[in-house]
From Swiss-Prot:
SUPFAM superfamilies: Ribokinase-like. The lineage of its organism: Archaea, Methanobacteriati, Methanobacteriota, Methanomada group, Methanobacteria. NCBIfam families: PRK09355.1 (NF006830). This is Hydroxyethylthiazole kinase 1. Keywords: ATP-binding, Kinase, Magnesium, Metal-binding, Nucleotide-binding, Thiamine biosynthesis, Transferase.
Length: 285
């Protein structure tokens, strides 16, 4: 078990910019451009390929893989499954972002197939989505309903629910044998042994389409240069700090959510060690 310091995190941020690894993002059509720009902003190189015919070739040249089920089609599901299988067979790390799991049969079956047959390095989602996954593996014994890509009111992480939710996420992570990254007002990350919380971010991030999808791809970028727990911590922290700074710039200039989205990419591209050290709200539980 390791304890990750802000110095460690800052070093990972610098390593990513130096190495510029290729991150393959199979993501949804709503946010694909934003995701590609976010990956570029943190220093990696994105490729966004969907054809099943080239799945193995693209994964073969990539350093990490991101699978986001936001806008599923039969062809994309085939690509996702082939890519995940090939990634595992060739020791390529990948992250699964089960967007909206729990609201339809196809959104339930697709991540289950991927998790069962090709264990992801990281599963990222809001608390409703992660609980829905846990339900399908009988880790939770009472029903929970996902609210599309948004978190249900009963699943909002706050000071009152933090300890119980940290224990829950640690248990789910241990049972699934993968790192879990949960997004919320307070983010929770666990590898089944250690649990970290991050309190960076801004409410404005929930007012634009794609902030969660961008986070998944940013985590995927860091996954190319470090282990799953450190990648999840680094990516979540970087995205949260950038969100805070972008929101401040938007408010200071009397701008709205459209400008905020642009500022968010700006801040991701500008983030450096001094900002990480001064702005981070990272805690080990």
């Amino acid at each position: 078990m390791s304890e990750y310091t802000l110095e460690n995190i800052a070093q990972v941020v610098e390593i990513l910019r130096e190495k510029s690894p290729l991150t393959h993002c199979i993501t949804n059509v709503v946010t694909v451009k934003d995701c590609a720009n976010a990956v570029l902003a943190v220093g990696a190189s994105p490729i966004m390929a969907n054809a099943p015919e080239e799945a193995e070739e693209i994964v073969g040249i990539s350093n990490s893989l991101v699978i986001n089920i936001g806008t599923l089609t039969k062809e994309q599901i085939e690509t996702m499954k082939k890519s995940a299988k090939f990634a595992i067979e060739n020791n390529k790390p990948f992250i699964l972002d089960p967007v909206g799991v729990g609201i339809s049969n196809i959104r339930n079956q697709t991540p289950i197939d991927i998790i069962t047959n090709s264990k992801p390095s990281i599963i990222r989602g809001n608390l409703s989505e992660i609980k829905a996954i846990a339900m399908m593996y009988d880790i939770l014994d009472e029903c929970t309903m996902a609210k599309g890509v948004d978190v249900a009111q009963c699943d909002i992480i706050n000071k009152d629910t933090l300890i119980s939710n940290c224990n829950l996420i640690k248990n789910i992570s241990e049972k699934l044998n993968t790192t879990i990254a949960v997004s919320g007002p307070i983010d929770i990350i666990s590898d089944g042994h250690d649990v970290y919380t991050i309190e960076n971010g801004d409410a404005m991030m929930s007012r634009i389409t794609g902030s969660g999808c961008m986070l998944g791809c940013v985590l995927g970028a860091y996954l190319a240069v470090t282990n799953p727990l450190e990648a999840a911590i680094t990516g979540t922290l970087v995205m949260g700090i950038a969100g805070e700074l972008a929101a401040k710039t938007a408010r200071d200039n009397n701008k709205g959510t459209g400008s905020f989205g642009i500022y968010l990419i700006d801040e991701l591209s500008k983030l450096n060690k001094s900002t990480i050290l001064s702005q981070s709200k990272l805690n080990k539980m």
